[in-house]
């Protein structure tokens, strides 16, 4: 699943904090529901855990969901609680499956978010990765993402640090060669972001960067490190009336270094590298995107 799902749902959930206590607790207050959508055109499909899924043609990825505000109390330690449900779809232009055509993957995810101690956020999501053409058996997983809001530190840019625990419950290995359930990896990362709007330039530049580590059986070998990734994303807020939501266009690239030899071996099994070649050590994935939230 795309890394951007976590980032976007965190941003939408954070927006719920702007509600006043009167609005949040009034008996006649309207339902506090927000939504989001992301459309990306990419030259590759590479998962956050470093699985190089597709490399020929292009891939279109669509993420959408709803965020339900459940409770908002600025005086409480846990000052905001919300619940997110959503889906992820991958459309691979070079796939021509008899039963699914170019529909390569369908995922669903759901879970609560807790904002606490003023600057911390914990997202908990259960989900499944499904293969419409039957390339793999359903993969059920549980993910915990802890992030810190460093906007109050007074730095000229935001670091946006986070750590994620991805636990594979059952089904096929999410990296092909690893254990089928009962294992995990940890993603340690940050998304340094520089906002140029104070300089009258309507752009944000971010550099999403992470590394994955975990027990060797997650990849099926003897190494405890998975993938290192870094890149640049330029985001432009589209001048669309707020009544239609908040829209952004973006472009950028993400570099991946497949540190674990099992990730490189998996490429030869999936066809993104030639059999016996040893796989690609690294890859750059370019993308264009459109997102909205309300």
Predicted segments, located by residue:
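Cleavable N-terminal export/targeting peptides
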Residues: 1-34
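Short loop/turn motifs that connect adjacent beta-strands in outer-membrane beta-barrel proteins
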Residues: 25-34, 69-84, 96-100, 115-121, ...
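Outer-membrane beta-barrel initiation region
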Residues: 27-76
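Residues that define the transmembrane beta-barrel architecture of outer-membrane proteins
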Residues: 33, 56-62, 81, 102-106, ...
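Membrane-embedded beta-strand positions of outer-membrane beta-barrel proteins
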Residues: 37-39, 64, 83-87, 110, ...
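Transmembrane beta-strands of outer-membrane beta-barrel pores
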Residues: 41-47, 68, 87-93, 114, ...
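Outer-membrane beta-barrel translocator domains and adjoining extracellular loop/strand segments
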Residues: 47-54, 95-104, 134-141, 171-180, ...
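Predominantly the C-terminal beta-signal and adjacent terminal strand-loop region
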Residues: 207, 216, 232-294
